[in-house]
Amino acid sequence: MNHTVQTFFSPVNSGQPPNYEMLKEEHEVAVLGAPHNPAPPTSTVIHIRSETSVPDHVVWSLFNTLFMNPCCLGFIAFAYSVKSRDRKMVGDVTGAQAYASTAKCLNIWALILGILMTILLIVIPVLIFQAYG
């Protein structure tokens, strides 16, 4: 067996900086820059889902429940709004959107029926008073 010892560092420092050699690979990378491949460069796109804003219509449902509640539509809309908020807190965006859509539809109907009932409760007594008064 051949045992030879190679020293990579000189034991004596004469006060001058060591002599560095430029390696061929380092020189080529510095001169050439980016590698030249025949294939076009590819890119990776990462989609990070931002928190989707799902309106739960709780305030609107509460308004319809307290002030105009024809056929209990406001109360039912409030229940669906709370379910939508619960689904959103869990992270189920699809379920939250489904419950919110139902709550919105119920709120629209509750508002329309409430306005119609209010108008009729004002118009009918006025018409009766004019007819018999």
UniProtKB/Swiss-Prot annotation:
Residues 1-57, 79-107 are cytoplasmic. The chain crosses the membrane at residues 108-128. Palmitoylation on membrane-proximal cysteines controls clustering in membrane compartments and antiviral activity against influenza virus and hepatitis C virus (HCV). Has no effect on anti-SARS-CoV-2 activity. Not glycosylated. There is a cross-link at K24, K83, K88, K104 (Glycyl lysine isopeptide (Lys-Gly) (interchain with G-Cter in ubiquitin)). Changing Y20A: Loss of phosphorylation. Accumulates at the plasma membrane. Increases anti-HCV properties. Loss of anti-SARS-CoV-2 activity by enhancing Spike-mediated cell-to-cell fusion. It is found in: Cell membrane; Late endosome membrane; Early endosome membrane; Lysosome membrane. GO terms for biological process: defense response to virus; host-mediated suppression of symbiont invasion; immune response; negative regulation of viral genome replication; negative regulation of viral transcription; response to interferon-alpha; response to interferon-beta; response to type II interferon. It is a single-pass type II membrane protein. Residues 129-133 are extracellular. A lipid is attached at C71, C72, C105 (S-palmitoyl cysteine). Its main location: membrane. GO terms for cellular component: early endosome membrane; late endosome membrane; lysosomal membrane; perinuclear region of cytoplasm; plasma membrane; protein-containing complex. The keyword Hydrolase does not apply. The modification Phosphotyrosine is found at Y20. PANTHER family: INTERFERON INDUCIBLE TRANSMEMBRANE PROTEIN (PTHR13999), INTERFERON-INDUCED TRANSMEMBRANE PROTEIN 3 (PTHR13999:SF4). Belongs to the CD225/Dispanin family. This is Interferon-induced transmembrane protein 3.
